[in-house]
Amino acid sequence: MLLNEIIDLIPNINKCLKKGKTLIIRIDINSPIVNGKIIDDFRIRAHSYTLRLASDAGARAVVLAHQGRPGQDDFTSLEIHKPYIEKYLERPIKFVDDIIGPEARRQIKELKDGEILLLENVRILSEEVIEKVPEAQAETLLVRKLAPLADYYVFDGFAVAHRSQPSVVGFPIVLPSCAGPVFERELRALGAVFEKRGRGVTLIAGGAKMPDTLKAVEQLLKNGFVEKVAVGGLVGFVFALGKYGVLNSALKQEVEKGGFLPYIERARQLLAKYGAQIYTPVDFAVNQNGRLDVDIYSLAQPPLDIGRSTTIAFKEVIEQSEIVIFSGPMGYIEDERFATGTIELLKAASNRRLILGGGHTIMAAEKAGVLDKAYHVSTGGRAFIQTIGGEEMPAVKALLTSAKKFSL
């Protein structure tokens, strides 16, 4: 079943937007944070639209979200997200430093029509970072404490749709549930691509999400959803080693450092089967008193970007395409000298129907000045990769279960 057909089976948010009703809305505003400050508020902007819909309808919105994971530097309170949400909503919201305790429950009960209450980082709850089947997650404290206070559940966090966690899959088991506009838009945009059945569709795959990206490449080619694939970043390193077998180069050292040597054989198998459709790097840029392009056989330093010859070859692939799915950068985009490959490819792709996925890709698109030219900008990182790879999303499965169980 195609994504457009699936989303049609799930009630959209309009079914849940009722004056005086309490909605639990799961969004994903997980954002890059440096020195305690949010440096990219793209997801917050996207989800502010959803919260505005709820507020304008006179619903009472209880917002669940997370930031980082326990033990990570970016695991912070959602209080720092509050002013960003208010900025894009152009209205005040409430925040409570609690999730399922007496204070949170009291404030939920006292919400007035049109008000929005942001709860604390849901991953403070240890049960939220444990993945289980939806029926088990429906028995967690989070769901048992909050569900009785709500009339509906709205899932809008596409970027966390691949997680089988309580805030994602638990509530649909016990509450009538709807798909939020961000989530619906994501599935419809990707569904439109898959309806093309690969004709004129190219995937530019970079970054370092190795297992997921490799699986996505395999599934997209196997199912005929893309015609061509061009690989860069760490993914490109693995494919280059699989194709050229340059096992004594700095390339191997970088792959080994990431623990990805076992994936070289899988890349080799994909190249043997789909070699004419997969384009791999032939040169790389290194830092040698500035940017220097080096061919794959002469590489003796850590590669930081695709080289000039590779960039030209990939641009030719893009120019022959109708749709370009861009997931992951080609190099170390934090350094302008090594963002060149990614930015040039993004500029070329902006003349096609461009779909962007992943935080680093979006940041690069902003640098390249092409973000506004994209046909669709996904809020998802790993969820985006897994969706285009054809994996079943736990959130989708839970929402379909809810749609069968409850009549809206």
Swiss-Prot record:
Family listed: Belongs to the phosphoglycerate kinase family.
InterPro entries reported in the protein's UniProt record: Phosphoglycerate_kinase (IPR001576), Phosphoglycerate_kinase_N (IPR015824), Phosphoglycerate_kinase_sf (IPR036043)
Coiled coil (UniProt feature): none
Binding site for ATP: 334, 358-361
Annotated organism of origin: Pyrobaculum aerophilum (strain ATCC 51768 / DSM 7523 / JCM 9630 / CIP 104966 / NBRC 100827 / IM2)
Chain positions recorded as substrate binding sites: 28-30, 43, 66-69, 123, 163
Annotated disulfide bonds: none
Cited Pfam families: PGK (PF00162)
Subcellular locations according to the entry: Cytoplasm
Assigned EC number: 2.7.2.3
GO CC term, one of those recorded: cytosol
Any one GO molecular-function label of the UniProt entry: phosphoglycerate kinase activity
Name of the protein in question: Phosphoglycerate kinase
GO terms classed as biological process: gluconeogenesis; glycolytic process
The protein's assembly and partners: Monomer.
Reactions catalysed according to its record: (2R)-3-phosphoglycerate + ATP = (2R)-3-phospho-glyceroyl phosphate + ADP
Pathway in which the depicted protein is active: Carbohydrate degradation; glycolysis; pyruvate from D-glyceraldehyde 3-phosphate: step 2/5
Gene expressing this chain: pgk
Keywords: ATP-binding, Cytoplasm, Glycolysis, Kinase, Nucleotide-binding, Transferase
EC class (word): transferase
